[in-house]
Amino acid sequence: MPDPTIWQADDGRYYCIATSPRRSLVSDDLFNWRISDISPIDSSSWKAISSISHNFWAPDVTIVDGKRLMYITLYNSSEDSNIAVLQESSPCQFQYKGIITRGRETGIEDTIDPEVVTDPQTGKVWMFFGSVGGIHRVELSKDGLSIKEGAKYEHVAGLTVHQCPNRSQVFEGSYLHWHKGYWYLFVSSGFYGNHTYQLQVGRSKELTGQFLNREGKPMIEGYATPVLHSDEGDNFFGPGHCGEIFTASDGKEYIFYHCHVRDSHHPGGRPLFMSCIQWDKDEWPYIEGGKPI
């Protein structure tokens, strides 16, 4: 389940989809998951998006203006990458609504990994996205189905791969989480296929503000605070591209993400992981031990 997104449906159950979302997982309690019999994208929508690309990456499911939407990457190349939006048409099934941004039009390399959030203070809807061309932010229309007319794309985090070929300060997989007065921007850096891939974070008091790491250095310059990592040779390696944070029935908060398993029967796969996330005295997130278990 690479690049997962999780949401709680109207029936109270939790659903998870990931890159190439031809199936979904369902859970009653966040701890025990099974394969759902619901296809998350209807057949006509599969036909529509397949005419644009055969790579469907990193979905993000969220509620905008009272409707549940799915944002997803349609990837052909770093230059020809697009973000599409789908709307829930029946419980946990989504229908294609269109492309909302195209990398060929904006010039932003790797227009991928969308994360959409509504600012409760202003009601404005924002999309964060990107990878090797930097993490960008842009305002969406109120209904979340298009870029707001006249909106500007702003680079907010991460160096480009041209500035940092080893990707240690190149970010992707944005996820935003509100906690005690701050917006936390979780990102992943490194190469997703090896141990260098890791989860990091910065924060800002406003969605439109500057995101900083623990030392006060700007994420736009490639700085972030580590949350989860692995070392070369670890059985669980390359943790990152987190999904959402939820509070479970035990009262603890858990973060979801993908991770490689070295001794797996499917070594190329990236199963779904979850870890308990805690907050230190300065309200910075951490995971005990700093590694997936």
Q: What are the residue ranges of the model-derived segments?
A:
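Carbohydrate-active catalytic/glycan-binding domains of CAZyme proteins
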Residues: M1-I293
